[in-house]
């Protein structure tokens, strides 16, 4: 199956801050991941094995928006124990060519 989509540049749309957030949880991680995925600023959620139970990618307007998202939405979710935020400084490579090899 092939799907053709347009990929926008968040910077060009006024979203100057992107970050990856590692989330540690207690309880049903699938339910927490679904709640994280429902947040408007979240564009990627994956359940993982290792240091984090979930990894979340967010796109925010600025650092204040990121801080608000962390404090009032992500960390406020029942079952979220802690987070670790990795702020993107520069996107070096991003490609969408799965299945073209």
Describe each model-derived feature in a short phrase.
Residues 1-101:
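A compositional/biophysical signature of low hydrophobicity enriched in polar/charged and small residues
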